Structure formats: C-alpha cells, structure tokens
Regions:
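Active-site loop/helix belt of alpha/beta enzymes
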Residues: 2-82, 86-90, 156
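C-terminal accessory subdomain/extension
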Residues: 88-214
Length: 214
C-alpha cells in the first residue's frame, strides 16, 4: 500500500497525523502488506512514517526537506555557466532587453551562455546571483533565451576571462536561495534544468563521468 502526504514539508501541519492514522487503518485492512508513505520531506517527520520503504526524490540532490529551515543535508548539485564575453563599460549604458538595468560608471559586464531556454528562470532577471570563487556577482538586466549578463566589476580581470566558469548554483548559492530569488520552489529549479547542460557525475562506484547535453 502506497500513499503520499499533502503537507510533508510542513512538519506541524495537522493533516500529517490524520493521514498517518488513515494509512495505518488501511494497512491493517490489507493484512500488514508492504507499506510506503514517506517522500523526501516525510522521511524527516520521524520513524513512524517510514514503514517498509521510503521514497527519497529531491533529497537525493540535497534539497532541504522544509523550506525556510536549515538544511540537514549536503547539496550535491552544482550549476556552472561559461563566460562568453566581457565588455568594459566606460559611460552610462543600459543592459539587456527592455533596458531594465543601467550601468552608471566605469564597470565590466560578463555575458554568460545560459538562459531561460536552459531552465534558468526569467523571473531571476535583476535578482539572480552568480559566484566567481567566493565572490558574488549580481545578475543585471533581463534573463534572455540563451544568455544572462553579470556585473563583474568587482572581480579581477584575469579571473573572469571568456571561457571561465561562473557558479549559478553551488556551495555559496544553494538551490533553495536560487528558488527564493526566483519566487518558486527548489523542485522547479532542479526539474527545469535543460538538456543543453553537460552533466558530470562525480563520486560513487563509477568515479567521474560526463553526459553531454543536446
């Protein structure tokens, strides 16, 4: 017997206990057959929700079980974009579609080859953040179909040359924070990552391997 909790990501939700009681009742009627109730968030509600097996889904990627609360797991997803070009801006200029951001003084803008066609949500326009090393670089202007623009004025020029990588999700910028900036949930961020990204799998019995995107 298998079921799913409606409020597992809210530990205090009263429906969790009521659903558990109903599940126990059904299981008794089915002569103690194999039982599974807990998804990723429900695993953390306690052993009474575990039964014979659990269904970790997004937890396999280190996403926190309760939005807005400290994450007990290590994040295992890292999303990087490659810098395509860097332009010096010497006079006031606008950036991107709709001219929604203006660079007022001398600065540098990096164009990164990631966009909403890759699942980097357009709602991150003028809100997203990348990291070069441990230094944040703000996303400026709108997210385009295939490109984003980052203000890299604070980064030494030799660290943000074309071909260098920027962390869009990583140790300094976890999925939960990206989701909050985008006004959504981590599930949407992860499931939306497009086929054009190259997947690299690190660790495990197979060591390191890569899978090319379309």
């Amino acid at each position: 017997v298998i079921s799913h909790l409606a409020g597992a990501d809210e530990p205090a939700h009263p429906k969790n206990g009521r659903q558990l009681e109903a599940f126990l009742d059904v299981r008794l009627r089915l002569h103690q057959g194999q039982a599974c109730l807990a998804n990723s968030s429900a695993i953390f509600l306690g052993p009474e929700y575990h039964f014979d097996m659990v269904r970790p889904g997004v937890a396999l990627y280190g996403l926190g079980p309760v939005p807005g609360q400290p994450n007990p797991m290590a994040q295992v997803v890292r999303l990087q974009g490659k810098i395509a070009q860097v332009r010096d801006v010497d006079t006031p200029q606008t950036v991107g579609y709709g001219a929604t951001h203006q660079v007022e003084g001398p600065g540098r803008i990096a164009t990164v080859a990631v966009g909403y066609a890759d699942g980097y949500l357009r709602s991150l326009s003028n809100k997203g953040t990348g990291y070069i090393g441990d230094t944040p670089v703000p996303l400026v202007g709108r997210v385009s179909m295939d490109l984003i623009t980052l203000d890299v004025t604070s980064i030494p020029a030799h660290l943000c040359l074309p071909g260098a990588f920027v962390d869009l999700i990583g140790p300094n910028n976890p999925v939960e924070r990206v989701a909050e900036d985008a006004g959504t949930i981590g599930y949407e961020i992860l499931t939306g990552l497009g086929r054009r990204y190259t997947r690299v799998y690190v660790g495990g019995a197979g060591g390191t391997s890569g899978a090319g995107g379309a």
